[in-house]
């Protein structure tokens, strides 16, 4: 920070850099420790942050700082493997219950997100995941990636579908 950031700021003043950004390593830092340290210094114009229905912790520890400092966010990991593959989701939920991050009484064994899947206003878990991220206060852009044109259209349609129903958002927050 003491060496690189001052030089980046000089280059920004010269017009050679338009925006300064920083990306967390969400897999290695799921509690956003680096961003909690970096954002209060107010050097960055944009951050790339992991945020999804399985780990929405950025809502409490990152977004308040980005909103306060007018920092844009690029949401990554909106749809993780676990949200697109039922077996992977069951495995992750079991791990979260075992670690104490999720209360076992709040989930159905083998069907943790049944209330999302069964809701008439939600086409799929993947759609719900994109809607969850895209309409979060503090989320600027939700990244999506695919090599399949049909999937890309579905992802864009999901992002544009509007926020999740209140009862779904409330239940996911539990």
At which residue positions do the language-model features occur?
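Glycine/proline-rich, positively charged
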Residues: 1-48, 52-61, 67-74, 135
């Amino acid at each position: 920070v003491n060496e690189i950031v001052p030089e980046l700021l000089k280059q920004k003043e010269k017009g050679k850099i338009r925006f300064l950004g920083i990306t967390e390593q969400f897999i290695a830092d799921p509690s956003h420790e680096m961003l909690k340290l970096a954002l209060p210094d107010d050097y960055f114009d944009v951050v790339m942050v992991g945020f999804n229905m399985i780990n929405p912790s950025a809502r409490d520890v990152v977004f308040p700082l980005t909103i306060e400092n007018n920092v844009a966010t690029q949401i990554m990991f909106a749809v993780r493997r676990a949200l697109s593959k039922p077996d992977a989701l069951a495995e992750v939920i079991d791990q979260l219950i075992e670690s104490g991050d999720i209360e076992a009484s709040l989930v159905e064994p083998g069907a943790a997100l049944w209330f999302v899947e069964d809701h008439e206003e939600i086409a799929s878990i993947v759609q719900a995941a994109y809607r969850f991220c895209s309409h979060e206060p503090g989320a600027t852009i939700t990244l999506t990636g695919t090599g399949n044109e049909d999937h890309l259209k579905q992802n864009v349609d999901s992002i544009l579908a509007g926020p999740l129903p209140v009862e779904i958002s409330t239940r996911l927050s539990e």
